[in-house]
């Protein structure tokens, strides 16, 4: 009797796992379908979502080294940086975002009045994981964070697959080895 109850609990546990996996797989398919729809919208708007060159891009590390901290709202030198969009925080007519390249991470400030309505609408539609190029002057926020005030933004490559959650990240060691590209994107310690 006790053995039967253990077996039935195991069966319940085994059936729950595939259901959860199917749910996350459906969620993944839904996210990918949304991103494919965004690619279609971009193409209809005359924007090529893949395969751009972005000449003159500097590394984040070189921008951090060369940018002298501007004081009292002054702007530093104009820089051109390309990287993967890692975070986006919208606040009405302005957006703060983070991009990351192989040398580090830097914050962006995108203002609607600075880049115009069309470019701002395009930036709002960008997803985490998309690769973008930006141009603009540097400044230091009140919190002491070096930031680029974006004057121009170019979509270099659209990401069709979503990145793993930031909070949980890639915890499974086997998955980190199988999907090394994700490990390199998400974990700075992997380099």
What kind of region is each of these model predictions?
Residues 1-191:
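Class II aminoacyl-tRNA synthetase catalytic cores and aaRS-like
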